[in-house]
Structures are given as C-alpha cells and as structure tokens.
Amino acid sequence: MKLSAWHKAQGDSVEWYEPLFSGHMDKVYMSKVFSFTPDYEYFVNADEVIKGGSGYCIELVNGKEVYHKERDAGLPYEVEHIYPDYSIYYGKVKDIENTAYGRLTLGCPRGCAFCHTGVKDGLRSHKVADLSEFWIGQKNIVLLDQNILACKDWKPLLQQLIDSGAYVDFNGGLDARLVTEEKAEMLGKIRIKTIHFAYDRYEDKKTIEPKFRTIKELTGWGRSKVQVYVLVNHTSTPRQDLERIYFLRSLDFSPYVMIYDKDHTKQGSFVRHLQRWCNNRFLFWSIDNFDDYEPWRKSAEYRKIESEVNQ
C-alpha cells in the first residue's frame, strides 16, 4: 500500500500484476512473510522484478530458521512514512474502506529463539510513527506492532488510540509479562475489537499467569475479544501445552495454537490434532477435554503419549 502510494505520487500507474492481462510492466514487486510460502514460479513480463519481505530472508539450517538481515532491504524512509494507498485492496479485503493498517512501534527486547523480530527490527521497541501517519478517521484500526508495551512511549501511543474512538485490533501478540495495572486500565479504555497476547514459553508460567489474571480483573474481557497465541513444538511438552491452554480457557480467553516448524510435523501428530481442536472455536468451546476430541483419541499418537500427558 505504501509502495503504491509512493509510485502514484510520482505519476506512475499502479495495478495488481495479472500475467494474462497486464502485459509488459516496467517494475513488479513481489513479497512474502513466511519462508514456506511457495515462490511465484511463472515468467514475469517486466523490466525489473523486486522481491522483498521476511519470507525471502529466512533459511532453514539444521532444522532451525535463520534470518539473514543483509537480504532485507526494507523501504526507503520516504516510502515507509507515506500515507498508505488503501484503494488497491478495495474489493479484495473485507471492509478495507473503513479500516486503517499500520504500526506505531518496531522491535522487541526479548530476543526469543523462535522469533526473528529482534534480528530484523532490533532488540528494542521504539516508536516509528504517530497514528495520524496511517489513520484519518476510519472506524477500524488494525495494529501490526510486535511489542508496543515495551516501548518507552507506550503511554502517549495508547492515548492516541483511546482518543481516536476507533475500534482497534491489536493483531500482533502483546507481551502480557509487561502488563501493569496502569497499562491494563489504559487498554481497557480503548475500543477493542480484538486483542492478541502471547503465552509462548511454559517457563514464564509464574510471571505471565498473574498478568493474565490482572487483565481479566481490570478489563472484564472474554473470549470474544481476547485471543492468546500459544507456541507448541518448540521446547514445551504436551502436558505443558495443555496446561497453558486450559489455564487460558479458565479465564474465558481463546487460545490459538501456533506450531513451530509445522512443515516438519506429521499429519497425525499431537500438535496437529491440538491445533485443529483448539483453533476451531466451535470444537474448543464444546469439547472441554482434549482427550475427548475423537480424532485425537482414535489416533496412534494418542496411545504413545497418553501416559506423559496425564502423569
């Protein structure tokens, strides 16, 4: 959207590339977020093809994803800070006419082994924009920040969201470990459409679970607003995965399972069944116990790890 806005400001014509209809183009941009997304395999009729995005910067080395920052050119300042051209998504993304997308901060101080944010955007959450850079009164705002609560400017930035009066979707997982009563109270003043947190590491149990209780007590939010990313297949055991999921359910929060290195897991594995059960809200809220989820109970993997899960 920003590239489109910048090119149009230079007098260029911008359109989605359609091989059968576009004809010859001067320049075509291609991007992808994830390394497992297949690349475009057909001929591109253009003088120049520019590829960008995290998906082109990640390699799997000895079973571990490695991010190559030197491959990530990023956007020039004048492009990064231009008001986005939302019109290119009209008819393609639901309610795009009434929704603003952007980020107020970049970076995260955590440096988690399973995440590329620290390498890509720095081990510090820092302000990169005010809300007015990508929002001009739309009724909805989708935020793509990685760790806004770690930014030293969190308070004025949250105040901007409060003052907007717009419905806000915190699409990135907020760091619940950084929640204080003051932060929870300010979050509670925002017109939340959806808010995402993360419970990635079982090792954080003693720190993070009291924070989730504080969020519940001060906001009263439930499953319709709160979704919590739960990382599995990294360092946790099946028992620890279920323990985190059941805890979140006890607060009426919706857990959402994210499988690390999913491409190298088997279809009938524990984590695949867990993801299907947990991420289907109808199944999750109607089947209280994972062991009562019939496809899992009938699987060979169930018999193999039943004793470990229930010990």
Please place each PLM-identified region on the residue numbering.
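Short, charged, surface-exposed secondary-structure boundary motifs
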Residues: 26-28, 40, 58-75, 113, ...
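A structural motif corresponding to the C-terminal lobe/cap of the Radical SAM core domain
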Residues: 189, 194-196, 203-311
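Core AdoMet radical
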Residues: 29-33, 116-211, 223-234, 254-258
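Anion (oxyanion) recognition and catalysis
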Residues: 8, 162, 246-250
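Ser/Thr/Gly-rich flexible loops in soluble cytosolic domains mediating phosphotransfer, phosphorylation
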Residues: 49-90
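Canonical Radical SAM [4Fe-4S] cluster-binding loop centered on the CxxxCxxC motif
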Residues: 1, 94-132
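A short, structured N-terminal alpha-helical element that caps or precedes a catalytic domain
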Residues: 1-51, 56-58
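A general structural detector for well-ordered alpha-helical segments in enzyme core domains, enriched
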Residues: 3, 39-45, 157, 182-186, ...
